[in-house]
Amino acid sequence: MDIKIDISISGDKFTVTTRRENEERKKYLPLQKEKTTDVIKPDYLEYDDLLDRDEMFTILEEYFMYRGLLGLRIKYGRLFNEIKKFDNDAEEQFGTIEELKQKLRLNSEEGADNFIDYIKVQKQDIVKLTVYDCISMIGLCACVVDVWRNEKLFSRWKYCLRAIKLFINDHMLDKIKSILQNRLVYVEMS
C-alpha cells in the first residue's frame, strides 16, 4: 500500500493532500497563528545555582517533596545543601525535633493538624517577622518532614507547604532567595 502526502502552504492556510490507491483527499486547515511554548519546570534536586527567574516556593515544594519521599540519602546539589543548613537554625529556635515530635504528637492521626496549629500560634507570637524566623521555619518543616517519612507518612510533606504559606509571605521568600544566592556565590568562590 502506497501513501503519498503533499503539503502546500498559502497565506494563512495550509493544504494536506493524501493519496492512497487512486483515492485523493484534501483537508484545508487554518494555520495556527499563536505560537505555543512548552514550559519546562526545572528539577532543583541537583541544582548548584539559584537564578532570579527561579521561584522560591517551587524550590521549597521540591525540597520538601524529595526530603519527604526519599530523604537525604540521594545525591543533591549545592542549593539543597544550603537549604539543609536551615535545620540547625530550626533547632536553635524551636528546640529538638524529638521534643516537638512528642509535644505535637506528629505521628498521630492529628499530627498534621497539630503541626499547622503550632505554626499559626508561632506566627501570632512573633511581633515582627524576620528572615531568621522564616529560615528557621523552613528548617523546622524539613525536620518534621523527616519525622513523617520515617513513620512512612509520605503524603504529609504537603502540610509543610501549607505551613510555609501561612508563615512566610512573598517578600520574605524573596529575601531568603537573596540570602541563598549570596551563600551559593560565596561557596562557589571559596
Curated annotation (Swiss-Prot):
Intrachain disulfide bonds: none
Keywords for this protein: Host-virus interaction, Inhibition of host innate immune response by virus, Inhibition of host NF-kappa-B by virus, Inhibition of host RLR pathway by virus, Inhibition of host TRAFs by virus, Viral immunoevasion
Gene3D superfamilies tied to this protein: dsDNA poxvirus
Pfam families found in the cross-reference section: Poxv_Bcl-2-like
Cited InterPro entries: Poxvirus_Bcl-2-like, Poxvirus_sf
Single Gene Ontology BP annotation: symbiont-mediated suppression of host NF-kappaB cascade
Superkingdom classification of source: Viruses
One example GO MF annotation: protein sequestering activity
GO cellular component term of the entry, any: host cell cytoplasm
Subunit-structure text: Interacts with host TRAF6 and IRAK2.
Stated family: Belongs to the orthopoxvirus A52R protein family.
UniProt function note: Bcl-2-like protein which targets host toll-like receptor signaling complexes to suppress innate immune response. Interacts with host TRAF6 to activate p38 and subsequently induce the expression of several cytokines such as IL-10. Also associates with host IRAK2 to inhibit NF-kappa-B signaling.
Protein name per the record: Protein A52
Organism from which the protein derives: Vaccinia virus (strain Western Reserve)
